[in-house]
Regions:
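Outer membrane beta-barrel
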Residues: 48-106, 110-143, 258-277, 426-442
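Hydrophobic, small-residue-rich alpha-helical packing segments that form membrane-like cores
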Residues: 119, 127, 137-204
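Exposed, low-structure sequence patches enriched in small/polar residues
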Residues: 5-15, 172-205, 212-473
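Outer-membrane beta-barrel proteins
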Residues: 35-53, 107-114, 167-170, 241-243, ...
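Long C-terminal interaction/binding lobes of large macromolecular proteins
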Residues: 79, 89-91, 105, 118, ...
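N-terminal periplasmic/intermembrane-space "pro-region" immediately following the signal or transit peptide
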Residues: 1-3, 129
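Outer-membrane beta-barrel translocator/receptor signature
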Residues: 3-18, 22-30, 34-40, 46-54, ...
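Surface-exposed loop/turn segments flanking beta-strands in extracellular/periplasmic regions
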Residues: 90-101, 147-163, 451-456
């Protein structure tokens, strides 16, 4: 182990966390969250303080003109995420009724996420009946790879299980200050957000063909304006933002909501390849608000009694190269069709088909490389059934098929069953789940939602062949 310190975890292989929360009415929230990932030391070795991650927060609401006051760890999100967004989102697979919802301002950070939060103070002040002004400041240590006084990359997973992971812990600092001015009118909502953040060392990733336009430098600032207009059953919403170099990103959406729960959405987005915002996150095919344009159209409606149809098509284009895509100017398509059946409150089932086509690098048998379309097809059947609010059952059957054009396909199957039972006479809930999976390789892996301890969940991926079971109390 001394010769090869990165081949064995420094701690035991169990995961656990501790949460304490207190709230008084809807005005005061306070709490602490502590977490140790599997493999991290606990009160030993490199970690003498017990848990690897601690999060303390205090949130006060509706005290005079102060709508929200946050101390300690908190989250902020404004507009539609082109400037700053620390929310967890389901992206394009969210229901159309929630897709494009405006972000929620200042909130407490009570989760175990070790990256998407800020540390300091944030306040929301009610200037007038329809006007609100927010301000926030953060100073925090962050994980990353620092080499020759440059920050080569930010480490976002929060793992500190090996020596090489501990070497990246708290190696840099980031300060952030920002504000948001919001108007909430009868027929419109308007917002203006400005954020400035600075690292203690310049951010300078090692240059690759795909990261030429990644954020570089010591300081960054962004300004964005968001809007939402209402007229009868129509709403027009969006946001436009610029960075310190004058490069811009914009997202605009038209929503039509007639009677009967129908939603029709048309959305256009343009994220310049050179746009830089460290904390931006919005709707898109990529994971960053950069190097993407697209057109999205979606429909959610009832076609028969108890049967609802959801479908969308997203056409996207990447003007510059991406990771594992060495060709500039690639494009793709993401389409979904889902039929849901819910005759009663206790029973719901749906079947979903998703098709995605995008260009990726492929190495042929003769070692020649080319960028060709990769096609992924997914099918899911899910049944949810509850009995008198005591027992909840969920059955899932998944299938995935992925292949490059003209090449053999990789297939994957997964079947899972979960059950949750609530004891009404005791403050106790029992959750059981089991899954069987069989895939050809890692490319055809399958992911499912899995409940964890209270207020926590995970989304593990499964590949090759095996079974998994879990039990939570």
């Amino acid at each position: 182990l001394k010769k090869n310190p990165n081949k064995q975890y420094l701690g035991y292989g169990y995961y656990h966390n501790l949460r304490y929360s207190f709230h008084y009415r809807d005005q005061i929230y306070a709490g602490i969250t502590a977490e140790k990932d599997a493999g991290e030391p606990f009160f030993t070795g490199q970690n003498k303080k017990g848990y690897d991650f601690y999060s303390l927060y205090l949130l006060i609401r509706n005290i005079g003109h102060i709508k929200t006051l946050a101390l300690g760890n908190y989250r902020v999100s404004y507009g539609y995420g082109l400037v700053i967004n620390t929310d967890f989102g389901m992206g394009k697979t969210a229901t159309l009724s929630t897709l494009g919802n405006k972000s929620r301002g200042i909130r407490k950070h009570s989760s175990t996420d070790e990256y998407n939060y800020f540390q300091g103070m944030a306040v929301s002040y009610k200037l007038a009946k329809r006007w609100t002004l927010d301000g926030f400041y953060s100073y925090r240590k962050m994980d990353g790879i620092v080499d020759n006084q440059f920050i080569r990359s930010l480490k976002k997973d929060g793992y500190h299980r090996l020596y090489r992971e501990f070497e990246k812990k708290n190696t840099l600092t980031n300060q952030l200050v920002g504000s948001n001015l919001n108007y909430n009118g009868k027929y419109c909502e308007l917002g203006l957000t400005a954020v400035y953040n600075v690292f203690n060392k310049p951010l300078n990733p090692e240059k690759k063909y795909y990261n030429i336009y990644y954020p570089r430098g010591k300081d960054f600032y962004n300004v964005g304006g968001d809007y939402k207009f209402f007229w009868k059953r129509f709403s027009l919403l969006g946001e436009t933002a610029i960075d310190k170099c004058g490069t811009w990103a914009t997202m605009n959406m038209l929503r039509y909501s007639p009677k009967g729960g129908t939603q029709l959405i048309v959305m256009n987005r343009y994220y310049d390849a050179k746009y830089q915002s460290v904390y931006a996150r919005s709707i898109g095919e990529g994971s960053t608000v950069q190097n993407e344009s697209g057109f999205y159209i979606g429909l959610e409606t009832s076609i028969l009694k108890y049967i609802k149809m959801t479908c969308y098509g997203d056409f996207f284009y990447f003007p510059w190269k991406k990771y594992l895509v060495s060709k500039a100017g690639t494009k793709g398509l993401d389409g979904l069709l889902q039929l849901s059946y819910s005759p009663t409150y206790e029973l719901e089932m749906f079947i979903r088909y998703r098709y995605k086509k995008k260009e990726k690098d492929f190495t042929a048998a003769d070692k020649t490389k080319q960028t060709i379309p990769s096609i992924q097809q997914k099918c899911r059947y899910q049944l949810n059934y509850s009995v008198k609010d005591k027992l909840t059952l969920k059955t899932i059957a998944d299938y995935v098929r992925i292949n490059f054009r003209g090449q053999s396909a990789s297939n994957g199957f997964l079947v899972s069953q979960s059950a949750a039972y609530t004891f009404h006479l005791l403050p106790l809930q029992l959750d059981l789940s089991a899954a069987w999976f069989n895939t050809d390789d890692y490319n055809s892996r399958l992911t499912i939602y899995e409940k964890s301890v209270l207020y926590a969940f995970s989304m593990p991926s499964f590949y090759y062949k095996g079974m998994r079971r879990s039990e939570e109390r």
